[in-house]
Amino acid sequence: MDGEMTASPPDISACDTSAVDEQTGQSGQSQAPIPKDIAYHTLTKALLFPDIDQYQHWHHVAPMLAKMLVDGKYSIHQQYEYLCLFAQLVAPVLGPYPSPGRDVYRCTLGGNMTVELSQNFQRSGSTTRIAFEPVRYQASVGHDRFNRTSVNAFFSQLQLLVKSVNIELHHLLSEHLTLTAKDERNLNEEQLTKYLTNFQVKTQYVVALDLRKTGIVAKEYFFPGIKCAATGQTGSNACFGAIRAVDKDGHLDSLCQLIEAHFQQSKIDAAFLCCDLVDPAHTRFKVYIADPLVTLARAEEHWTLGGRLTDEDTAVGLEIIRGLWSELGIIQGPLEPSAMMEKGLLPIMLNYEMKAGQRLPKPKLYMPLTGIPETKIARIMTAFFQRHDMPEQAEVFMENLQAYYEGKNLEEATRYQAWLSFAYTKEKGPYLSIYYFWPE
């Protein structure tokens, strides 16, 4: 589209609950309530977008992002900083905006987009996070069929603004976990067509930004499915092989062996790998699994690595999981692919965190929430926050959720809060995150 665009679409409301003075930077004398997403509305008056896709991504994501920043008690300055960063760095790499009948590159973040918002809750407060797959239109028209190039273009921009980002691990791990240009050249057209057809979602990279009050922490997720199909490896061989390739001194080998033994025993394969984009010596590696057998017994088995983790944190965390699982009424049973596609149900997921100097892997469980009414989830979360010394979160959780999905019936909706992740340490207590899906 030739013209540049600004201003809010006519259906965007400005009537959310008011923000406190220090969050908005505005006088408390105003008679009209100040909308939570005032920073979004203000920036919209000054932002020009080069195409309609960036314009649509901004107006789709920024209102909810702005509200989350207010709810997380970010200063007014950081609210504008992080919203501007989204507009200038992230929106340009979200690709063609998906709409009915438009045949564009597909990712499943947030349910149907290339971007997902989430919130982390601890006793110290909440943190807003954004995850996305960098993509450009070339992935939709066949020039970059496996979307290999967009992530590098994004990192070149991110490093200009976020000096703490170190992409050494991106280069080292990409070789082992993603389809490289050399791999693609070595495949004939028949093989390429097969992979393009068999993999409805071709995601190989996802970038996540923790928008902390102390600054941004960047993480990268590597999805080795296409690489494994081309090379004949298992996901576990690819992920643990990649870790060992960069862990030259073997600091993580005993942790890897512990996790690998459980994977072999439980007949589960690694799904993807995550690392912090920092100095490789200080990064955390997280190996993920996704299990369609959604039962508490299976979750317990994975949480304890088949009984291999017997420390106090694991035991206390397991008791909390049992309570949450029962209260939430997690929809159980083996999930067939049709149930995931047609009913939108999700598997259980876990990750196992490893870091040099760490004695044991740290498990984190992702409980699938789709199919459960949003208000029920919110009531359970409110009660949980009250029990675990998070009174501020308990007071506002339900109200905040309704603000994120303004005008939606949360008594009937069952697909907005998609995942609840949980980890536990005695030092910090419960560590929970909610991952949000976009309305259809």
Curated annotation (Swiss-Prot):
GO terms for molecular function: aminopeptidase activity; peptidase activity; prenyltransferase activity; tryptophan dimethylallyltransferase activity. The keyword Cell inner membrane does not apply. Residues 20-32 have a biased composition (Polar residues). Substrate binds at residues 108, 116, 223. InterPro entries: Aro_prenylTrfase (IPR033964), Aro_prenylTrfase_DMATS (IPR017795), DMATS-type_fun (IPR012148). GO terms for biological process: alkaloid metabolic process; protein prenylation; proteolysis. It catalyses: harmol + dimethylallyl diphosphate = 6-(3-dimethylallyl)harmol + diphosphate; an N-terminal L-tryptophanyl-L-alpha-aminoacyl-[peptide] + H2O = an N-terminal L-alpha-aminoacyl-[peptide] + L-tryptophan; (R)-benzodiazepinedione + dimethylallyl diphosphate = (2S,3R,11R)-aszonalenin + diphosphate; (S)-benzodiazepinedione + dimethylallyl diphosphate = (2S,3R,11S)-aszonalenin + diphosphate. Pfam families: Trp_DMAT. Its EC number is 2.5.1.-, 3.4.11.17. Residues 1-33 are annotated as: Disordered. The keyword Transcription regulation does not apply. Keywords: Aminopeptidase, Hydrolase, Prenyltransferase, Protease, Transferase. Dimethylallyl diphosphate binds at residues 129, 219, 221, 286, 288, 366, 431, 435. Accepts only dimethylallyl diphosphate (DMAPP) as the prenyl donor but shows broad substrate specificities toward its aromatic substrates. Also shows tryptophan aminopeptidase activity with preference for linear peptides containing a tryptophanyl moiety at the N-terminus. Belongs to the tryptophan dimethylallyltransferase family. This is Cyclic dipeptide prenyltransferase. It comes from Aspergillus fumigatus (strain ATCC MYA-4609 / CBS 101355 / FGSC A1100 / Af293).
